[in-house]
Amino acid sequence: MSSQQSKVVGLIFGGASGEHDVSIRSAATVAEGLSSGANKERYRVQHVYIDRQGRWWGDATARQVLSSGQALADDGSRPGFSGFPDGCLEVEIWYPVLHGPNGEDGTIQGLFSLMQRPFVGSGVLGSAVGMDKLAMKAAFSAAGLPQGPYRPVLASELVSNSQLLEELETQLGYPCFIKPANLGSSVGISKATNRSELQAGLDLAASHDSRLLVEKGLQVRELECAVLGGQHLKASVLGEVSFDADWYDYETKYSSGLSSTQIPADLPEAISSRAQHLAIEAVQAVGASGLSRVDFFYEEASGNLLINEINTLPGFTSQSMYPMLWKASGVPLEELVHQLLELAQ
């Protein structure tokens, strides 16, 4: 394929969210896949970087950020969007690698839709439902999918409901986990084993979001399954995450040596098969497409398999499960990014 026939791919990363650094690392992996093998001829990459202040930067600056792995320092100029950098209007397919708010919540997907350009991943609805943990769990419930005990909490209840702590203790007990509804990579999440930790966890989560989720802590194995496709979805082999820390927090996820993965997970065939079917049902329940990672809790003693959450724009770093699960399923990085671009709509 000649360069004249190469499709221009807009690889957009960074973003004004707490997962900015993870996005840079994910984009570096995607860029590697786009420059490998036959993809070098198939695609011409236009890199676009969004800094922490929401400013958009063109190819030269974006490449510098990718090569250094470091976020761009704030130069004090006016924050927010001030126009597309050079090259954006040439882009034929957008490949968003933006994690967290303004990246995987339907906002950037809405912009691409307005631009009438195809893009990798879920559309506005699937992204928004998958991002908001309360909407996601409601969608899972409506589809009859198995979940652990939880309670939605509004930040306003921390002031208006004097019985909140007692109600949570009665309904869920300890340990429990407190999460903001709209952040990923375990940002703003805490574990509570007593009332003071519960109060502190609610305050922390409320500092990130007005919608919160409190979940019962369970003695489980943590499994993950990658899903790929549009109308026809396929599920990867299962992976298992183990960690030395008390729980799988942000530092554990992204610090070398604190967590380990086993791919494929050592599971009975019936459990693996059921998880793969449930993963596809979870993607359909929220209306996602393209790529998703579905996380499970497996209660080994009872054999129960519970859906924890879906991530419609999963991490793509060198230690992220999504690309590793597909590699173990016979889809290497080069082919994976190509398939995702082929699925763009």
UniProtKB/Swiss-Prot annotation:
- Which Gene Ontology CC terms are recorded? cytosol
Q: According to its UniProt record, where is this protein located?
A: Cytoplasm
Q: Which domain of life is it from?
A: Bacteria
As to how many cofactors bind and how, the note says: Binds 2 magnesium or manganese ions per subunit.
Entry binding sites for Mg(2+) 2: 309, 311
Task: Name the positions where ATP binds.
Answer: 169-224
- Tell me which UniProt keywords the record has, alphabetically: ATP-binding, Cell shape, Cell wall biogenesis/degradation, Cytoplasm, Ligase, Magnesium, Manganese, Metal-binding, Nucleotide-binding, Peptidoglycan synthesis
Return the InterPro entries for the record. Answer: ATP-grasp (IPR011761), ATP_grasp_subdomain_1 (IPR013815), D-Ala_lig_Van_CS (IPR000291), D_ala_D_ala (IPR005905), Dala_Dala_lig_C (IPR011095), Dala_Dala_lig_N (IPR011127), PreATP-grasp_dom_sf (IPR016185)
The top EC class, named as a word, is ligase
Residue stretches making up the ATP-grasp domain: 137-342
Q: Where does Mg(2+) 1 bind?
A: 295, 309
What is the reaction catalyzed?
2 D-alanine + ATP = D-alanyl-D-alanine + ADP + phosphate + H(+)
Please tell me where this protein is predominantly located: cytoplasm
Q: Provide the GO MF annotations for this entry.
A: ATP binding; D-alanine-D-alanine ligase activity; metal ion binding
The cofactors required by this protein are: Mg(2+); Mn(2+)
Supply one GO BP term: regulation of cell shape
Enzyme Commission (EC) number = 6.3.2.4
The biological pathway it contributes to is:
Cell wall biogenesis; peptidoglycan biosynthesis
Matching Pfam families, A to Z? Dala_Dala_lig_C (PF07478), Dala_Dala_lig_N (PF01820)
NCBIfam families recorded: D_ala_D_alaTIGR (TIGR01205), PRK01966.1-4 (NF002528)
Q: Which family does it belong to?
A: Belongs to the D-alanine--D-alanine ligase family.
Summarizing the function annotation, the protein's role is: Cell wall formation.
By its UniProt entry, which PANTHER family does this protein fall under? D-ALANINE--D-ALANINE LIGASE, D-ALANINE--D-ALANINE LIGASE A
Designated name of the protein: D-alanine--D-alanine ligase
Task: State the organism of origin.
Answer: Synechococcus sp. (strain RCC307)
